[in-house]
Design a protein with these regions (language model features):
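Adenine nucleotide-associated cytosolic modules
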Residues: 1-278
Length: 278
């Protein structure tokens, strides 16, 4: 049970049938890994801190530049030249002093990435390049950790949630009959198999409108709160949500599992071999 102070602070979301007091308790115990502290990570982290998520790990090796302030709304003028993880952690603690924040100001190698993903209840991919997204996808698939990914460029944004079948305690407390969890779901590599060495357009070249970045980060926060509080994504998993900021319109595309995917098919085969060896 929550004490009176916590109940009062989070009463507006506790009042939601889908969350309630037990869902809020889950949020307070949750461990979230946010990789990338730019526009997406800013928006998502602020709302997760406000919602009462207990423990957040921030990963980014970059520093705040003046051009970031157009869309990375947690940062202020005084943060220019500071590490993004430190500046964002400072803002999150001002919003929620009880939040436990750990910062990592370097790129994670494969071993460290897998460790951090294993420790997390959910991962938010807020990065801006395909190779890193593929590594995060692989780690989340390996550890069966839910992944919420988003991106934005120009006036367009995209969002997708992958539920790889969590082994974490928060989900175990909930009804595991969720229809959004697939036994063998598609992964990010199924969606973008060509992306490892692809040349990607940068925001500095193509431009980006700030509110679109914020919207995608907010979608990541919404999906994360759903999963942590209720044990399931209420939104349809494994569907690519596309947003057009010029027409203010949404489109949804189903992601089909690639039977030749070298990431999730290999992982499935390895899991099968482990099962048969026991």
């Amino acid at each position: 049970m929550l004490d009176d102070r916590l109940f009062t602070r989070y009463q507006r979301q506790i009042a939601l049938t889908e969350i309630g007091e037990s869902g809020q308790a889950n949020l307070l115990e949750a461990h979230v890994l946010i990789i990338g502290c730019g526009g997406l990570g800013n928006a998502a982290a602020l709302y997760l801190a406000a919602a009462g998520v207990g423990h957040v790990v921030l990963v980014d090796d970059d520093v705040v530049e003046e051009s970031n302030l157009q869309r990375q709304i947690a940062f202020r003028q005084q943060h220019i030249a500071s590490l993004k993880v430190d500046a964002l952690a400072e803002q999150l603690k001002q919003l929620n002093a009880e939040l436990r924040v750990r910062t990592i100001d370097k790129r994670l190698n494969e071993q460290r990435l897998n460790l951090e993903v294993m420790l997390a209840d959910i991962v938010l991919d807020c990065t801006d390049n395909f190779p890193t997204r593929q590594l995060i996808n692989q780690a989340c698939l390996n550890q069966r950790t839910p992944l919420v990914s988003a991106s934005a460029i120009g006036w367009k944004g995209q969002f997708i949630a992958f539920d790889f079948g969590s082994r974490h305690s928060i989900q175990a407390k909930q009804d595991t009959s969720s229809t959004t969890t697939s036994v063998n779901p598609p992964c990010y590599h199924c969606l973008f198999p060509f992306a490892e060495n692809a040349t990607q357009t940068k925001c500095s070249d193509a431009g980006v409108i700030g509110p679109v970045v914020g919207l995608m980060g907010n979608y990541q926060a919404i999906a994360t709160i759903q999963k942590l509080a209720t044990g399931r994504f209420q939104t349809a998993c494994h569907q690519l949500h596309l947003f057009d900021g010029l027409t203010l319109s949404w489109q949804q595309l189903a992601v089909v599992k690639d039977p030749s995917c070298r990431v999730c098919q290999v992982q499935k085969q390895e899991s099968s071999n482990e099962h048969h060896s026991h």
